[in-house]
A protein has these predicted regions:
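Metal-dependent nuclease catalytic cores that hydrolyze phosphodiester bonds in DNA/RNA
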Residues: 1-78
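Surface-exposed cleft-lining segments at the edges of enzyme active sites
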Residues: 3-7, 120-125
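Conserved catalytic cores of phosphodiester-cleaving nucleases, focusing on short active-site segments
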Residues: 18, 79-103, 110-116, 137
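A structural signal for short, well-ordered beta-strand segments and their strand-loop junctions
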Residues: 63, 90-93, 152-157
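Short, flexible loop/turn elements at secondary-structure junctions
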Residues: 66-70, 83-85, 96-98, 157-159
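Gram-negative outer-membrane beta-barrel domains
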Residues: 71-72, 114-120
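Short, mixed charged/polar active-site loops
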Residues: 74-76, 89, 171, 181
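Metal-dependent nuclease catalytic regions and adjoining charged, substrate-binding loops involved
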Residues: 123-191
């Protein structure tokens, strides 16, 4: 199925990038952020190798692939990279979509699609969806850590080099001699 092939391609690229970022940061035990050397807090893993949610109280450090949850609201999520430094929580999420849309779809009548209430003032686009996602992660973390303040919410959008398109217009990704996808661009969206 054509759609399944495109879905598989997108999932493989996304997983590859996320795994690369996590492996790169876990090569170190500390890292400098905002002029402060902080520890890298490794994700918790159970006996079978499955990542599990840690205690939600955060201390200064960098948390790759951090599970955040709020039992009272029955919500959880996984932030790609959380940094706690100088009394603030910063969240970065990696996105590997073909594009990040900043505006909702506008039809031939000039009507732009909006989200549903209570967010009906916002365009229905993936940048706003991601903003809500990261804002919810921040909300969860601040509920568990009331002495900390909200820092930056950042989307890191990664695009890959194409060597062409297939018969259906989907991209064919370029790979380097080691078989790794070639990154074309990184764009940061500070929300």
């Amino acid at each position: 199925n054509i759609w399944d092939n495109e879905t598989d391609r997108a999932i493989k690229l996304g997983n590859w990038y996320h795994n690369q970022r996590e492996e790169n940061i876990l090569d170190f035990s500390t890292i400098e952020r905002e002029g402060v050397v902080v520890p890298i807090i490794r994700p918790l893993v159970d006996g079978t190798g499955v990542k599990i949610a840690p205690v939600q109280k955060l201390k200064d450090g960098v948390y790759p692939e951090h599970f955040a949850y709020l039992k009272s609201a029955a919500i959880c999520g996984q932030a790609d990279l959380v940094t706690v430094v100088n009394g603030k929580i910063h969240i970065i999420d990696y996105k590997t979509n073909k594009e990040i849309k900043e505006k909702g779809y506008t039809n031939w009548e000039g009507i732009t699609s909006k989200m549903y209430k209570p967010l009906s003032h916002l365009d229905d686009c993936n940048l706003n969806h991601y903003n809500i996602q990261l804002s919810l992660y921040m909300y969860i973390m601040l509920k568990h850590n009331p002495k900390l303040k909200a820092g930056k919410l950042i989307i890191q959008h990664v695009t890959f080099e194409k060597k062409g398109v297939d018969d259906y217009g989907y991209p064919i990704i370029k790979y380097d001699p080691q078989g790794e996808p070639v990154i074309k661009d990184l764009k940061m969206y500070e929300l």
